[in-house]
Amino acid sequence: MGKLTILVLVAAVLLSTQVMVQGDRDQPADRNAVPRDDNPGRARRKRMKVLNESECPWHPWCG
């Protein structure tokens, strides 16, 4: 019985992975969507630059 449970779980994981990889094709609403940010770390780097340029009360963390 334990092997059957593991087999069912593995099959479910493989099926869900296949759905995530293939997706649901190009839907009409997707074409009008706002483009995603290709550089998500940009805002974080800007904040760190401001912290580094300003007087920082936490010297060990500000670099």
Curated annotation (Swiss-Prot):
Residue positions where 4-carboxyglutamate is found in the record: 53, 55
Propeptide feature: residues: 24-51
Domain of life: Eukaryota
GO cellular component entries: extracellular region
Record: residues binding Ca(2+): 53, 55
InterPro entries according to UniProt: Conotoxin, Contryphan_CS
Keyword Hydrolase among UniProt keywords: no
Name of the protein in its database record: Glacontryphan-M
Signal peptide: 1-23
Modification type D-tryptophan: residues: 58
